[in-house]
Amino acid sequence: MTTWANMNLQDSASPIMEQLIYFHDHALMIIIMILMVVSYMMIAMVFNKYINRFLLEGQMIELAWTIAPAVILIFIAVPSLRLLYLMDEINTPTVTLKTIGHQWYWSYEYSDFAKVEFDSYMIPQDEMDHSMFRLLDVDNRAVLPMNTFIRIIVTAADVLHSWTIPSLGVKADATPGRLNQVSFLINRPGVLYGQCSEICGANHSFMPIVIESISTNGFINWILKMNM
């Protein structure tokens, strides 16, 4: 999760988020280079008088400032399109989790197993202990196995919501009457935090998302416990 005064992105917990961080750094490097070149040219124009009465045209410079931006855009667009394809790709899922947004809590249904469904509410501040995070911890976490392809089916029961886990690079709009799906793989154990990312009413800020990533054996034991 994010930490106090953190200026960077959250640590990735999925291959997609790793690729998003790489693309962010790649695009930022190009932007910084453009900023340096443009800043140098502006400063040079201020402190130098480049005046040539005999210069009537500059076809080469016009050609250069037409081709150079096109090449730069290609260097940005190619990895971006590749990443969009990877994010939209759905592998054969081992576990399917249906997520339903409500005002103002989440419901989870494990469609592959019988009788495994529950609601997830934010824990009020007066019921928290010192190990919990304000406005982020919930009473029932969604438990998922790591190193396993997971499909999330997202919908809403009332208004627009958005199911978002930044450390997984996952954001899916929850629309009433419509099913959206995303696929991801969690590559490490831990507790992952997120929040609704769509303005959905007065208590929009109070419907956090908590995913607990555990081993496959631990997940099977949890499913057996939930079915008892």
UniProtKB/Swiss-Prot annotation:
Cofactor entry: Cu cation
Mitochondrial intermembrane side: 1-26, 83-228
GO molecular function, one term: copper ion binding
Enzyme category, top tier: translocase
Binding site for Cu cation A1: 161, 196, 200, 207
Regions crossing the membrane: 27-48, 63-82
Cofactor comment: Binds a dinuclear copper A center per subunit.
Alphabetical keyword list: Copper, Electron transport, Magnesium, Membrane, Metal-binding, Mitochondrion, Mitochondrion inner membrane, Respiratory chain, Translocase, Transmembrane, Transmembrane helix, Transport
Record SUPFAM superfamilies: Cupredoxins (SSF49503), Cytochrome c oxidase subunit II-like, transmembrane region (SSF81464)
Annotated positions binding Mg(2+): 198
Annotated catalysed reactions: 4 Fe(II)-[cytochrome c] + O2 + 8 H(+)(in) = 4 Fe(III)-[cytochrome c] + 2 H2O + 4 H(+)(out)
Subunit comment: Component of the cytochrome c oxidase (complex IV, CIV), a multisubunit enzyme composed of a catalytic core of 3 subunits and several supernumerary subunits. The complex exists as a monomer or a dimer and forms supercomplexes (SCs) in the inner mitochondrial membrane with ubiquinol-cytochrome c oxidoreductase (cytochrome b-c1 complex, complex III, CIII).
Functional note: Component of the cytochrome c oxidase, the last enzyme in the mitochondrial electron transport chain which drives oxidative phosphorylation. The respiratory chain contains 3 multisubunit complexes succinate dehydrogenase (complex II, CII), ubiquinol-cytochrome c oxidoreductase (cytochrome b-c1 complex, complex III, CIII) and cytochrome c oxidase (complex IV, CIV), that cooperate to transfer electrons derived from NADH and succinate to molecular oxygen, creating an electrochemical gradient over the inner membrane that drives transmembrane transport and the ATP synthase.
Protein name (Swiss-Prot/TrEMBL): Cytochrome c oxidase subunit 2
Species per Swiss-Prot/TrEMBL record: Periplaneta americana (American cockroach)
High-level lineage: Eukaryota, Metazoa, Ecdysozoa, Arthropoda, Hexapoda
Gene encoding the protein: COII
